[in-house]
Amino acid sequence: MGEPAMKKVKFYLCAVLLCIVFFASCSDGNSDGSSGSEDAKHQSTDLKDGWWNDTAFYHIWVKSFCDYDGDGCGDFNGIKSKLDYIKNDLGCDGIWLSPIFECDYKSKSPSGNMHGYDVKDYYAVNSYFGTEDDLLSLIQACHDKNIKIIFDFVPNHTGKGNAWFTNSCEGGNKKDWYVWNNSKLNWNPGMGSSDTWHKNPKGNDYYYAAFWEGQPDLNFRNYEVREEMKNVVRYWLNKGFDGLRIDAVRYLIETENSLVDTPETHAWFNELRKEVIDSYKEISPKFMVCEAWIENNRSALNAYFGSEEKTEFNMVLDFDQGRGCYNSIYESDSRILTSTLYKNPSEIKAYGTFIGNHDEYMGRIASWFGGYSAEIKLISAMSLLRPTVPFIYYGNEIGMQEGNYNGDLRLRTKLNWTNVEKQRNDDSSILSLNKALLALRKEYPSLFKNGTVKELKSSTVNTETKNPLYTVAAYTISDGKDTLLCVFSLKNVSDNKFWFDCGDLDISSYSVLIGVNNEKNLSLDGSDIKVEYIAPYETRVYYIGDDKKEMLFTDKRLFLRGDMNGWGYDEMLYDSEKRCFDLWYKLDPDSYQFKFDAYCDWTLSYGSGEENTAGKTVPLDKEMQTSTEKGENTNFLFTPLSSGTYRFTFYEDDNTFVIRQE
């Protein structure tokens, strides 16, 4: 590795010169000179310090969310028109806007990846999204509905089209605003291309760009840069934003020893917190959330909270917890889930948790699971049922899949509002589950802000191998007053009975809040808790206590098992408009016995209700009545007259079904 170069630093030998620099005007059109919090307008009212720990954030990719003026590009007015959806139909009361500043690459085409991280002007909004007045109107509309709104801030680098960079390339008064060296150095922080030094288009030296050539790094060893970036934050907080998410925080300042997470980087964020963020406490408390893409290193991640003496971020985005949710389902192993479940550090420090975002983190959750709603609901519940601050990436609340593009553009496609409307009217949809879970969080704010998580150890064993089974996860969240028991099936099989070590948990009285039904399926079996009739990929939430609670969400599920699938089980598709379940099979002229199962469980089926073990004969196109009660019912018998595709339809209102040839 070559000898590292230090970012150029100007040393000021006296306080007079220091003051001159501090009050100097940065006058090249990419600066405003705004300073104090006393200029703040359009602010939220009645906010208390730590409000972010009670907030559920909705992450919006502005270009793709809602196109109000019909020009092919999402905009501020489109977001404003959908605030009732965000607040009432979903239940989020915070919004994170992806980059909104004027940027180098712009495109309204769906195939154009206008991401905004190549900032051209920090003091101007992207004209494709609307005007600054449109943005201020959106901010005010959010506050009128008690919705907080934060912006995406990119301090590490600008775009090449930024006037600062042009001046720097030409050797002007901002030459030292970027990182230059006379030759290429072997610097590779591990992001983007390994070639991080690029030729000056107007000179013979080289500039550093940690991510890619089009995003040159600012020089935070330059006092003017440090102060100007603080001014940018002040400018937008004064416009009414409630906080900011800061991008790529790890790469701000390089040293001889490291290119990431340096003490100098932490020092600047302490300055930003102390001099800017905390100065708004008496007006309207602001907060900043850190994007430090760190996995499997809690100490490095937690370092961005700072210390008691040198505070930094109010919140850090947690890249471990979302991946833990996915891996626990993929591996069908509850130990992965519980080992990556962390609670908020305190009432004013928080982990921001999510299961997918705009980057190549994990992709769209619906695409991971092939659009299978049961798994999508399961991972959504895993993410929201923990004492952290949730961030929902637009579209994930309806199980939106990836677009037909390469790279991260596939994660940034237009939201399907037709699908939104359909799910709004389906009380068993992915959207309805998200709404129910967010409502649950609002009902028990203390529990989800600073509750304690306790894992229930599995005491279930494989009857053949005698090894412990980990296909169902369970833990409690408690704040000393209220307790929730959360149970998750991590495999595409039913579990008639599953046992956990109950410890000191008293389950003598409980209510089912979320699940396939609200039947009594929790009991004490010796020193163990026994959970019964768990459907594949089911989420079940119990309120533990004497107070009787209403069920918040019923997941409507039905399975068909019979000769056509080897007496396995296939989940039927639910049609909320027709209130029925459908499933299609290609069948030959033969005899097929079958029945409908409520939980993929033999003992809880809708069958003929007769003693004829050969099955009750079912004619084509004739509505048939099943047993009205679930139990060990006998089979139905169907004999197609010809080969073809047959649709089995089960109507939930009266437990009838019909078979039709397609």
Language-model-derived ranges and their functions:
Residues 451, 508, 588-590, 642-644:
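A glycine-anchored, Pro-Gly-centered beta-turn/N-cap motif
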Residues 146, 160-161, 165-188, 273-409, ...:
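Conserved alpha/beta catalytic core and glycan-binding cleft of carbohydrate-active enzymes
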Residues 551-591, 599-626:
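Aromatic-rich carbohydrate-binding modules that target alpha-glucans
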Residues 105, 110, 279-280, 345-507, ...:
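Loop/helix patches that line or flank the sugar-binding groove of alpha-linked glycan CAZymes
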Residues 26-28, 42-230, 234, 238, ...:
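Acidic/aromatic-lined carbohydrate-recognition and catalytic surfaces
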Residues 525-551, 646-657:
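C-terminal beta-strand-rich structural cap/linker in extracellular carbohydrate-active enzymes
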Residues 1-5:
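Short, Lys/Arg-enriched N-terminal segments with co-localized hydrophobic residues
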Residues 14-22:
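Bacterial N-terminal signal peptides
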